[in-house]
Curated annotation (Swiss-Prot):
<keyword id="KW-0813">Transport</keyword>
<feature type="transmembrane region" description="Helical">
    <location>
        <begin position="52"/>
        <end position="72"/>
    </location>
</feature>
<keyword id="KW-1133">Transmembrane helix</keyword>
<dbReference type="InterPro" id="IPR003691">
    <property type="entry name" value="FluC"/>
</dbReference>
<keyword id="KW-0406">Ion transport</keyword>
<keyword id="KW-1003">Cell membrane</keyword>
<keyword id="KW-0472">Membrane</keyword>
<dbReference type="GO" id="GO:0034220">
    <property type="term" value="P:monoatomic ion transmembrane transport"/>
</dbReference>
<dbReference type="Pfam" id="PF02537">
    <property type="entry name" value="CRCB"/>
</dbReference>
<keyword id="KW-0407">Ion channel</keyword>
<feature type="transmembrane region" description="Helical">
    <location>
        <begin position="83"/>
        <end position="103"/>
    </location>
</feature>
<comment type="similarity">
    <text>Belongs to the fluoride channel Fluc/FEX (TC 1.A.43) family.</text>
</comment>
<keyword id="KW-0997">Cell inner membrane</keyword>
<protein>
    <recommendedName>
        <fullName>Fluoride-specific ion channel FluC 1</fullName>
    </recommendedName>
</protein>
<dbReference type="GO" id="GO:0005886">
    <property type="term" value="C:plasma membrane"/>
</dbReference>
<feature type="transmembrane region" description="Helical">
    <location>
        <begin position="21"/>
        <end position="41"/>
    </location>
</feature>
<keyword id="KW-0812">Transmembrane</keyword>
Amino acid sequence: MNKKYLLTFLLTAYCATFLRFYFKNNFVISIIGSFLYGFFISRKISKSKKEILFSGFFACFTSFSGFVHFLYQFIIQGYYLKLFIYLNVIVILNLIIMYIGFQLSRKIT
């Protein structure tokens, strides 16, 4: 792994982490991340840029641990119905948003 690649990867991850703290709402972060993921996955991008974008940026921005922590709060508070509804809504909605991003990107190119 060369230094330029590593530096770019770390900088991208840092920027995503910074943006993560700017948006406090996990739902909004999830929707934005899914749309952008779908948008960029259909683009013709080099393998190294995809690795940087998907593993560096999206992994830090959408942070699965933040999502799980949010769901865990429902469990602690005993809101099992909210947990079930939120989990299903967020998964289905994110798949739809990702698909929209993918289709939009294909129409642009």
